[in-house]
Swiss-Prot record:
Major localisation: endoplasmic reticulum
Signal sequence annotation: 1-22
Assembly and oligomerization: Component of the ER membrane protein complex (EMC).
UniProt-recorded name of the protein: ER membrane protein complex subunit 1
Listed InterPro entries: EMC1 (IPR026895), EMC1_C (IPR011678), Quinoprotein_ADH-like_sf (IPR011047), WD40/YVTN_repeat-like_dom_sf (IPR015943)
SUPFAM superfamilies per the UniProt record, alphabetical: Quinoprotein alcohol dehydrogenase-like (SSF50998)
Organism: Pongo abelii
Amino acid sequence: MAAEWASRFWLWAALLIPVAAVYEDQVGKFDWRQQYVGKLKFASLEFSPGSKKLVVATEKNVIAALNSRTGEILWRHVDKGTAEGAVDAMLLHGQDVITVSNGGRIMRSWETNIGGLNWEITLDTGSFQALGLVGLQESVRYIAVLKKTTLALHHLSSGHLKWVEHLPESDSIHYQMVYSYGSGVVWALGVVPFSHVNIVKFNVEDGEIVQQVRVSTPWLQHLSGACGVVDEAVLVCPDPSSRSLQTLALETEWELRQIPLQSLDLEFGSGFQPRVLPTQPNPVDASRAQFFLHLSPSHYALLQYHYGILSLLKNFPQTALVSFATTGEKTVAAVMACRNEVQKTSNSEDGSMGSFSEKSSSKDSLACFNQTYTINLYLVETGRRLLDTTTTFSLEQSGTRPERLYIQVFLKKDDSVGYRALVQTEDHLLLFLQQLAGKVVLWSREESLAEVVCLEMVDLPLTGAQAELEGEFGKKAAIQDGLLGMFLKRLSSQLILLQAWTSHLWKMFYDARKPRSQIKNEINIDTLARDEFNLQKMMVMVTASGKLFGIESSSGTILWKQYLPSVKPDSSFKLMVQRTTAHFPHPPQCTLLVKDKESGMSSLYVFNPIFGKWSQVAPPVLKRPILQSLLLPVMDQDYAKVLLLIDDEYKVTAFPATRNVLRQLHELAPSIFFYLVDAEQGRLCGYRLRKDLTTELSWELTIPPEVRRIVKVKGKRSSEHVHSQGRVMGDRSVLYKSLNPNLLAVVTESTDAHHERTFIGIFLIDGVTGRIIHSSAQKKAKGPVHIVHSENWVVYQYWNTKARRNEFTVLELYEGTEQYNATAFSSLDRPQLPQVLQQSYIFPSSISAMEATITERGITSRHLLIGLPSGAILSLPKALLDPRRPEIPTEQSREENLIPYSPDVQIHAERFINYNQTVSRMRGIYTAPSGLESTCLVVAYGLDIYQTRVYPSKQFDVLKDDYDYVLISSVLFGLVFATMITKRLAQVKLLNRAWR
């Protein structure tokens, strides 16, 4: 009974550990969150002059509505991040948005005003092909869902199934298009590649097959993305082999009609797949007779097919993007073109057509030199350009170009046409344009930040006055300036600081009279400087699209951005800080290593992380694939750390490669080691550097890939500091930590997927000698595994398949009560293995990311920051994951303040550091030290970005915000006044005593 009460007491004591919380008036003071939706896949703009929103579906499986006036997210629904949540199609009708996701398995209807779910149904299995609205009696009533083998009709209001019919010969025919225009029938169009097209007409009321037509098309491979239905159900397909258009009236004809393009002085581009881009403003009415023909990457033609006659309305030989839009009875064509006449070709990926838009075919497409584009509107009936509809805008980043164009058209009071345009560029930038002389770009969104792949924080530089003060104490300044010069420099520096302090005080008094919401703290990159406690830093973010950002950490303001157009999708990135701002007047320097996934080739980019400018230092040209990169503590004469690059021939390239650097590498080569991991072969190899900059294999470890595979290799952070080298135990002895900076944690997972035979293994390996320090395995466990490796401990999380729960396992390494070598660590001189303590805990939730807090000196207690699938970030004290927690408390364990062991780790809402500012689909957490030992800066990134500060041991080195300055000042003044009075009274008393 006593043990039970003691256990409860220690449990309550653990719950009383200080937590980091915020008051209501502190929300947004030290933290911020930015929400994103990702790269657009579909977009629909409401066609009304008072419309304030646009609905989008993205490649991040997000359905959202954006405020068209500000660009803010009105509502957002985030589906699963896997292929199950992918949005396959989206249609907008009135106040309803219809989406199909999960490969055609789920169809939903959303209310556009608040984002509410109207209905959701599960569709039959089968490969999804197309989605369309079906009108009947001048109203849209049904939704047609075309799959590989079936065509189904659902009620628009409820989603209930009206009928479903099997498609004839679906085994050999690829049905890809569905069409209806309110005539009581719906067509399903399929193709047998390079053979024929099959057209099946269904009755809307009962699903009966009314007609089936087979037409020979030996030149046609695909219907979708090539053909289109124009006018009253006329199928138009381009035929590159005969350089003509083939037409077929679905209602009346059974053979294709060939119309040569030579009669219109048009010609297809060589090697380019032409496309027909039709428009159907209303599902109840037939498609417009006018359509765009995409002839080559930059050549479009506006054609009209009416009563069997094809005519050219307007030719656009130099065009980037086109789009249709309708308001009332007017349909216009929007054409985007480069403003300058001189253009050049560039290479990228192929594109495809989206809803209400056209995605540029990137291969051999044209890009502007000056990055300036114009948008003009043309009346589709005549091809005449509408006056006063020209909008000109410029793109900031060179190398990028518009990729999608969406147009929102409305009628003005004078019956003229006005419009707004949504443009998406290759670097995932969203621009919303309007027709105003003063401000064309209404708002912009950097959606590439929805996929941050690596991140670093860089200290801000000193101000000019601070830099001068720093330079006063140098030896060169004393020799050059002399005593009088140094005195005058000090005097001028102090005057500058006095002026800055006076202006700062004036701003504080001026802002004190305003509400906090009205205080504008404008951040300018030219006046950016380090604050008193180094809490304000520059966040350098690299995104998957190849775009770099410089973001000020205290406000989230984007100060600079750069785009790398040559970066291909699925490339891997590694960002390294070679020189910080501590080496004035040398500018800080970051190096980005980009590796192409397909070819394996790598490239280096060197830039200034504060101003975002490319460095004048030329990086080496990498002619071989890079296997490993090392940032050494060795510096050149300009204080830049040396970067070693090891290629597939095990040759080493140094950057920078000056004489000073090569001399230092020649001296330090025997002490430079590195490792390589080949996960496919299950090999870990250790190498050492020779004096001639070649490599030598020092050890090799093979893990059988047919039994287990390597999933993660985790080392320690080079920037972390360990303050205490041991732990004081209850008997006053010291248990010394095993602080091996070369230790690697290798996580393996079984290849057998059966839940009874799965296991997770971990190896602790010395990266210099290849010695296995410790190995363990968790049977009946599987990943994904999240791991944190710091100081002398390793924490990793996995899924227990037997108990069906998430678990933590913590490992701690100790040398014992005697320290082998207290002055220097050497992996080559370690005769005894360290003691390894291990313990497991149950965690009630899966996790998305995990990282440990870090501070400047390592004095503050460590916390684990755990990102949950709900978007919350849990700050868990490392003391709760201590393998020395006893099951039965003893006198010594109480002396050490060890919490009695309990297998459950509870989640308390008070430990959430982001309260209700959740981070959707979190992928990583980054921590960085500040100038205050108590404070750790945290950035969580995923679909959103969240930045805050945490205080694992509370703020012991700075006064709190609610500190009562008035009270302490009044007490001090009172004490001084009382001292003066008491002194006077004492003097009078002594004088009176002397007279007696």
